[in-house]
Design a protein with these regions (language model features):
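A short acidic/basic microdomain associated with nuclease active sites
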Residues: 35-71
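Acidic carboxylate-rich catalytic motifs and surrounding loops in phosphoryl-/glycosyl-chemistry enzymes
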Residues: 49-52, 120-128
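Short glycine-/polar-rich loops that comprise or flank the Walker A/P-loop
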Residues: 114-118
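Conserved catalytic cores of phosphodiester-cleaving nucleases, focusing on short active-site segments
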Residues: 37, 66-91
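Mg2+/Mn2+-dependent nuclease catalytic core
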Residues: 86-112
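N-terminal targeting/trafficking signals and adjacent low-complexity tails
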Residues: 46-50, 85, 93
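Non-catalytic C-terminal interaction segments of nucleic acid-processing enzymes
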Residues: 1-9, 17, 21, 28, ...
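Conserved alpha-helical elements of sugar-nucleotide-dependent glycosyltransferases
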Residues: 25-33, 105
């Protein structure tokens, strides 16, 4: 009986630590996007979704929106970004995939996309604050929730410091023209 209690206790804390680690990686990737990809040189940050701690005490309805809302400083166009970081790809080449959006998230983001464009930023590999690859795919091109294959993300890859180490990180911000071209591949 005591052994079962200890096992349950171990599983509970293992999952708790695993979830905390996953959330931390997500936060680091979000910081990377704001600091290096969607820089204040090109974009104003209009909205940042509440963290889980705020929602624990009182649920904030706007938490159902994507993580960020930006405004292009050149054209004044507004758009949303949902950030997803995954440490590694699952499956074997050439059919590698990641799990990334639930059905309800995809439905919500497609509704938001009817008013303002929604992009899903997917970071993979290396560290969350400096991923190997970053993909920025308009949600309107995502047909199925839960998992997405690497081969479907490749056309939406953006340059980053890992891919081009000779570049300085501040030179790798995503210019607005490159952002808007993604809507018309």
């Amino acid at each position: 009986m005591i052994r079962r209690f200890i096992d349950a206790f171990d599983v509970f804390f293992y999952r708790l630590l695993q979830e905390s680690n996953s959330k931390r990686k997500g936060q680091l990737f979000e910081e990377h996007l704001v600091d290096w990809i969607f820089t204040k040189e090109y974009y104003d940050l209009l909205h940042l979704t509440q963290d889980g701690y705020t929602n624990f005490f009182r649920y904030v309805k706007s938490s159902e929106y994507p993580d960020f809302k930006f405004q292009d400083r050149i054209s004044d166009k507004k758009f949303w970004v949902e950030a997803k970081y995954r440490t590694e790809w699952l499956g074997d080449f050439p059919d590698q995939y990641i799990y990334f959006l639930t059905e309800s998230q995809l439905e919500r983001y497609k509704e938001v996309d009817k008013k303002l464009p929604v992009f899903i930023a997917v970071g993979t590999g290396n560290k969350a604050h400096n991923p190997n690859q970053i993909y920025l795919i308009p949600v309107r091109f995502i047909k199925v929730a839960y998992k997405i294959y690497k081969k479907h993300l490749l056309p939406f890859e953006i340059d980053n410091a890992f891919k081009f180490p000779q570049e300085k990180k501040h030179e790798l911000a995503l210019p607005p023209q490159s952002l808007w071209e993604r809507l018309d591949p």
